[in-house]
Amino acid sequence: MQKIIHVDMDCFYAAVEMRDFPELRGKPIAVGGRSDRRGVISTCNYEARQFGVRSAMASGYALKLCPDLILVPGRMQVYKEVSSQIRAVFERYTYLIEPLSLDEAYLDVTDSPHCKGSATLIAEAIRADILAETGLTASAGIAPVKFLAKIASDLNKPNGQYVIRPDMINEFVKTLPLIKIPGVGKVTAKKLADLGLHTCSDVQAYPPAQLIERFGKFGTVLIERSKGVDKRGISPNRERKSVGVETTLAKDIHTLEQCRAVMPQLIQELGARVSRSAKDRTIHKQVVKIKFEDFKQTTIEHRSDDISVNLFYQLLEQAMERQHERGIRLLGVSVGLASNSSTTDDSDVDSSQLDLGF
């Protein structure tokens, strides 16, 4: 049985700013771009969240919700330096570390000799070390599998931790809302709700074959997660190459206008996912994916260093030139993330030639 810890810093960027600039403490602040430049919130503190401000929200809208919101420009180099300090703390307890972003990581402490092998005590020690050395608080989730550890880290925020023991899993997942499962966004949650599926117990009672037929590979993943199963191990060298969102349509659509109507929700969800899991990574391309009624698919991509709504619509128009009167059953958008060592090109490619990792 694995012992997995998911460590998540509390309001990381905002917390660093409040640490370095004490005059910001106790006030609603957000790290993000200026509203007059169509900026987006990267993160905000808890004072701002009380007004409904959230990550991936347009700065202009955030200011409408919270007129006293203080917008702070990001200092990425500082955040990276603090992240290195946090990583050094992790390495005292285990070498099996899978970073998800600058402020978040999975740790496998199954064979760690520290704290008498107790994952709970190791998590407490890690959080105490981080606080002592950086002045920042962290929350943690402890569980036998990755996705439950990630969920658990949210249950006692800020500056807390939550343990899901092996004997707790069955009861814990019964009432777990599906929206809490990593990979289930608003679009997928709506489709599941339309089937009467709201919690893991609902999925457990649903015919597996129908779920797999409707959701493909993700249907299999959903069935496993609903039972508390997650076969993934820690990947120390893991580097996410892309972040994407796609939707299988309730019925085939045929026109560009119909496709354009689907795009806003996809783009909004993509922005949220990038903010959650890749906010410290550099975007190098945008991609639109279409799957047709004959199950053949195509992708169009173009170089971009940010999420441009207009570019997504331009790529959609180009992809639709390959429709040839076929119905459209799936639409997807994604961004490619640059590796520290790789180079990219901006040529259009067909999905048969490139796995975009949707």
Swiss-Prot record:
Entry keyword set: Cytoplasm, DNA damage, DNA repair, DNA replication, DNA-binding, DNA-directed DNA polymerase, Magnesium, Metal-binding, Mutator protein, Nucleotidyltransferase, Transferase
Active site: 104
Cofactors required: Mg(2+)
Note on how the cofactor is bound: Binds 2 magnesium ions per subunit.
GO function term, MF aspect, one: magnesium ion binding
Enzyme class at the top of the EC tree: transferase
GO terms for cellular component: cytosol
Localization per record: Cytoplasm
SUPFAM superfamilies in UniProt: DNA/RNA polymerases, Lesion bypass DNA polymerase (Y-family), little finger domain
Positions bearing the site annotation: Substrate discrimination: 13
Catalytic activity from the UniProt record: DNA(n) + a 2'-deoxyribonucleoside 5'-triphosphate = DNA(n+1) + diphosphate
Residues given in the record as Mg(2+) binding sites: 8, 103
Domain UmuC as annotated: residue spans: 4-185
Membrane-traversing stretches: none
Source organism superkingdom: Bacteria
S-S pairs: none
PANTHER family in UniProt: DNA POLYMERASE KAPPA, DNA REPAIR POLYMERASE UMUC / TRANSFERASE FAMILY MEMBER
Protein name: DNA polymerase IV
This protein's encoding gene: dinB
